[in-house]
UniProtKB/Swiss-Prot annotation, chain A:
The modification N6-acetyllysine is found at K179. The lineage of its organism: Eukaryota, Metazoa, Chordata, Craniata, Vertebrata. GO terms for cellular component: kinetochore; nucleus. This is Mitotic checkpoint protein BUB3. InterPro entries: G-protein_beta_WD-40_rep (IPR020472), WD40/YVTN_repeat-like_dom_sf (IPR015943), WD40_repeat_dom_sf (IPR036322), WD40_rpt (IPR001680). One of its GO terms (biological process) is chromosome segregation.
Amino acid sequence: MTGSNEFKLNQPPEDGISSVKFSPNTSQFLLVSSWDTSVRLYDVPANSMRLKYQHTGAVLDCAFYDPTHAWSGGLDHQLKMHDLNTDQENLVGTHDAPIRCVEYCPEVNVMATGSWDQTVKLWDPRTPCNAGTFSQPEKVYTLSVSGDRLIVGTAGRRVLVWDLRNMGYVQQRRESSLKYQTRCIRAFLNKQGYVLSSIEGRVAVEYLDPSPEVQKKKYAFKCHRLKENNIEQIYPVNAISFHNIHNTFATGGSDGFVNIWDPFNKKRLCQFHRYPTSIASLAFSNDGTTLAIASSYMYEMDDTEHPEDGIFIRQVTDAETKPKSPCT
Amino acid sequence: MGRKKKKQLKPWCWYCNRDFDDEKILIQHQKAKHFKCHICHKKLYTGPGLAIHCMQVHKETIDAVPNAIPGRTDIELEIYGMEGIPEKDMDERRRLLEQKTQESQKKKQQDDSDEYDDDDSAASTSFQPQPVQPQQGYIPPMAQPGLPPVPGAPGMPPGIPPLMPGVPPLMPGMPPVMPGMPPGLHHQRKYTQSFCGENIMMPMGGMMPPGPGIPPLMPGMPPGMPPPVPRPGIPPMTQAQAVSAPGILNRPPAPTATVPAPQPPVTKPLFPSAGQAQAAVQGPVGTDFKPLNSTPATSTEPPKPTFPAYTQSTASTTSTTNSTAAKPAASITSKPATLTTTSATSKLIHPDEDISLEERRAQLPKYQRNLPRPGQAPIGNPPVGPIGGMMPPQPGIPQQQGMRPPMPPHGQYGGHHQGMPGYLPGAMPPYGQGPPMVPPYQGGPPRPPMGMRPPVMSQGGRY
């Protein structure tokens, strides 16, 4: 089912996968959080699980602070930091509701968590300790770091941009340009904007600069839709990941497809084969050679029989991820 | 729009009668839609330029400008942006617009709903609701496949298919009439929506513009009438219109009959593929885009009808200060809004409630076990020493439920929210820890967020 450039990880989690993240400086290690309450670290080339630690509830997101520390949070409301070398765990803090997102901002050296308790909390990773709690208008669904800014996507299609160095006020309050619930936001590597996906098979490319000339450049497109028997099935676009080098991005949807897009030429570069079930998370390695694809049923159609969840590791080529020369 | 009188109006495309905000955008549109080679997709600058290119490079002749409305397909006219448009067509256009503005003034009083639509004009590069090729690349902003490909009336995207049967008979006879409709989708949209909404006036308005200028065409209309007549809802309208027509149009009832035709059906398929959602969310739809360009801050209100949850959350949002017990509890217990989905031709693969997939999954019983209860110490894994003793594994849970004093019912988040009041100061008498905020701690010793240290140590019976 998979080609020689792709394989499935051994010892996958025993329930759905919520998030996959590569180590910041190597494509060797992949951190995986799961609904089976575990967080696992995999040695990708060796295709083996190196380490596993537990939460008491499903883990919804994980992130590397640095190559040796993993942070994770989930339904048990707890934010944990785990030292991957010593296997030591540290309960850093909690939210009042499940933690949905965990991200690290290298520029400001702070960890950020977003929760369904409608707050974003910042954490100093060195101590580690809480460095502030910031109210959001709605439950936080997604977070992305852009330079020294934090882009927060909440329920109600709201998007807030915070300046991590000045959290006294919200830098920008926006509304998603898509009409449906926001699923995922990822910032462009050039810090000019972000990509936002919704549950309705659509992705928007937006810019942070509020000036009208820049705002005119924003656009959106439909994707992850399948036509079957004259009925168009529209799938949520759950995952977005940027390729560090080419500035192209991959999207994964509940249709089980992964597409790679070139945002500047506005073209789709590639679509991989269909995966067994919904794509829950995507992660490019920092060197852009590898893409981790979490294929995990997301209960879009309730609790039903579904193909096995798994994590696929795919070696990507330039042909798949590099922009072609621009057309006129 | 730096010219004096010659233009006077917003730039518009002579080939398809669409309106644009800016001449630059108009030119981009022309290059992409009318001057693009169908063989190699090269964009030329003018009609003749395209013809020459096809001849020289592909050895093919073309005789009509692609995507142009009938009557405007002349490949030999050298038109670039607004330059080169024959004077008489300019005049016609001006007249049309004048009539339209009269129309829209009349309309303004009537039509209060959706002026917005997602299919926001050429000028907007924000969003391509193209009904086609989701699997291909996505189409650059200037190309709006849903619209231009269809010349004239049929070209009116989603909302107009129903118009076709009644209209085509008119078209050949009066191309200039069509312009009354399509130019500037914006305008057209207004008309369309008002079709749905109410309007007997509107359709009349649609026909009006051509009226004075094209008397000879009127006779052409009756042939168009019969088809619309059988449509449901038309008869009543026809009558009503017949009544009002004289007052409005001083035209024979003939035109009225044709116009109502599209009305009943228009409501539904207004934007079939352009995000079926839009059919339901006409109002909020546009406001998503408009406010974005103007004042994002004001855009909290727009999605009223379709997403009540948003409304209520925006309402409650304003009162939110910091994360406190009350708010989360309120949001949880309120019923989530349901998504207004799709039309018959599309299906949104997502549960009906407008909550995230993760929230929905978290509500499943299997994920509710051993979640922290209010006042409960955070359960670490074995390494967290003493707690291991207190928190018996899963089997112990039911018993915990019975134990804990503030035992809220199973909530969305494992009851944690409802329990919040439980660990505000006072709830934990021995420990009344003030700040709900988590004090820094170094893991290791089990330090529950709520400062229930001793109880943690003592035993698990508490929870």
